[in-house]
Amino acid sequence: MAESGGGGGCCPPMDLMRSETMQLVQLIVPMESAHLTVSYLGDLGLVQFKDLNSEKSPFQRTYAAQIKRCGEMARKIRFFRDQMSKAGVPAKEMQGKENDIDLDDVEVKLGELEAELVEINANNDKLQRSYNELMEYKLVLQKAGEFFSSAHRSAADQQRETESQQAGEDLLESPLLQEEKSIDSTKQVKLGFLTGLVPREKSMVFERILFRATRGNIFIRQTVIEEPVIDPNSGEKAEKNVFVVFYSGERAKSKILKICEAFGANRYPFSEDLGRQAQMITEVSGRLSELKTTIDAGLGQRNILLQTIGDKFELWNLKVRKEKAIYHTLNMLSLDVTKKCLVAEGWSPVFASREIQDALQRAAVDSNSQVGSIFQVLRTKESPPTYFRTNKFTSAIQEIVDAYGVAKYQEANPGVFTIVTFPFLFAVMFGDWGHGICILLATMYLILKEKKLASQKLGDIMEMAFGGRYVILMMSLFSIYTGLIYNEFFSIPFPLFAPSAYDCRDVSCSEATTIGLIKVRDTYPFGLDPVWHGSRSELPFLNSLKMKMSILLGVSQMNLGIIMSYFNARFFKSSVNIWFQFIPQMIFLNSLFGYLSVLIIIKWCTGSQADLYHVMIYMFLSPMDELGENQLFPHQKTLQLVLLFLALVSVPCMLLPKPFILKKQHEARHQGQAYAPLDETDESLHVETNGGGSHGHEEFEFSEIFVHQLIHTIEFVLGAVSNTASYLRLWALSLAHSELSSVFYEKVLLLAWGYNNPLILIVGVLVFIFATVGVLLVMETLSAFLHALRLHWVEFQNKFYEGDGYKFAPFTFIFTANEDE
């Protein structure tokens, strides 16, 4: 299958439409040059290695220790990246080449730097924790001190008031009161207290739990701290309250301590003595200033160390990633029996054979190997991977095609046509040259700044737009083209190419139908005559035009898809598919909808008033009836009968012969009677055989083949109708876009203009801009994009595209520097 070239004779080879010719190669590499060989092949990026040790676990492979070593170095580099990111230290651009440094030196250097950085971080964390604890302690001293000082003042005031009252009372009562006072003083209970901070969101629950646990035998006061404080345990900012709890007895104290621990409340010692409090505040403030100086010095040393790491970070990162990738690939190679050579197998394009051999030779010379590597091509029945060479212009279109399914090996590539048809169908739905210019300007910014933007991390949506910038460029150019055809600039018509061909008979003709218009000049040379816009017949005329145009475009693209199936069949030498798939499909589709397209063109050319709906419906319901006024050309009835007969005959031609022919070819192949039919087998059977590897006699289930063909036939017959109707979305979305644009212009911009008020005009212009950008340039663009995508995936590609291949994924270093592990 793969070895066959393009179709000969009248058929072009279509090299641009086929994936690159691939070959399965075997490399026998000496152990001493294996590492350098894989490195050079990674730089080349044209070999997809096969895993020859798939039965072994990762730990049983030859280079498991080296991969573990590289993984440890990669962990250290990730640690450095996180630390640099937190400190705001950027990594400098790579200077020098990674080949100039030795991996052992890198490993030693990384280990030393990590140990030093970990030690600095540990010391800094301890100092920062102490600093945060002292900050909390200082707040407790301040807030609790305020509470105690206010309590002392209020107690002193109350005592003075009580003494003054007692002095004025009767002298007979004085001994009695003094006796009572002396009795009370002997019964006084010593109260203890605890101070600390509790998170504010837990403060109410904390107070309630304390009250219940001690049965109300506590007194608690809380004070709010205005600014958030850094918690010493978590290192995060938190809003907290200072609390003071008074209790009686050791049992109550133990309960309070447990509750404080459960709520994460930090406790700090506190003295009742006011003089001692002031002394403690002074001591804490002094220690805080000392710690602050020490922490700043530690952070400065840490930043110097991180800047040293940043100078070589990119170089080390690339070196470690490359080494890890090389050892992963070496683990896919198998040892030969002598354990002196490694054997590799993989896919590569045929054109790369010379480059691969040059890389092998350079690796042998550079590693001073006594023996060179052996390169040989293997014969196989496996299906090769699919490889299309793309550039930055075509890669996005190829990604759109591959999102549906990767092409089978050397299957015709829809991307060749999609480069043009996708933006064109988008533009049919988005035809407005004003909107097209807006999208063009935005896309030109992405293209002009592509070098700068390519090196930056963009958001998900922006990343997607940047990746498809050339697709959007084509979409905008085609939108300008179709907008000129529709003669719409933000829904406003302009006589760009010539004056209108029509004039009004009287002043009121703009409100009438086209009967009020007189043709006074030549037909408008390009696109739609601007006189249609604003007339009563604008909508019926545009509906008729765009609906018929959608059918013509749809039938043309579906015919292109069927023609591509012919070239696929020629390429894979499957005459069964030519005679019993391509020809019946072409006959069926064009007998019905090809005929409808011809009628549309004839009606346009002749100006006939024939009802094409009536013609097509009664072509099936009453084929023998006369057409009458709906006849467009002589012998139309006879032609319709012939076309209807051909359409009916083509259905059994698609369904019945192919399964029986495949069965006969299978029997002949395995009875040894004939070998010629091998080339004419259906390509789907080739894939099954190839996938089976060494199976000599594949199973042939006639019932499965017949049911598959039955489904395929029914799908095509019904799809011919539904797919044609599906292309009417071109008409519907184009009409919706035009009407929305017209509504925004007339009901927002013109309405605001009519008020003669500058404020209303500014508001109206802003609403018009936001509505145009948000709805028409964003939502409508996305909607038209998705509908164009569906038309290509379903209506076009299902006519010929199997898409059951797998992508060529070579071993390469190109993306190693940009991808995160």
From Swiss-Prot:
Residues 2-421, 491-548, 603-640, 780-821 are cytoplasmic. GO terms for biological process: proton motive force-driven ATP synthesis; vacuolar proton-transporting V-type ATPase complex assembly; vacuolar sequestering. One of its GO terms (cellular component) is vacuole. Residues 97-144 form a coiled coil. Disruption phenotype: When associated with VHA-a2 disruption, day-length-dependent growth retardation associated with a reduced accumulation and storage of nitrate ions in vacuoles. Increased sensitivity to zinc ions due to a lower zinc ions sequestration in vacuoles. Reduced calcium content. No effect on sensitivity to sodium ions. Essential component of the vacuolar proton pump (V-ATPase), a multimeric enzyme that catalyzes the translocation of protons across the membranes. Required for assembly and activity of the V-ATPase. Involved in vacuolar nutrient storage (e.g. accumulation and storage of nitrate) and in tolerance to some toxic ions (e.g. zinc ions sequestration in vacuoles). This is V-type proton ATPase subunit a3. It comes from Arabidopsis thaliana. The gene is VHA-a3.
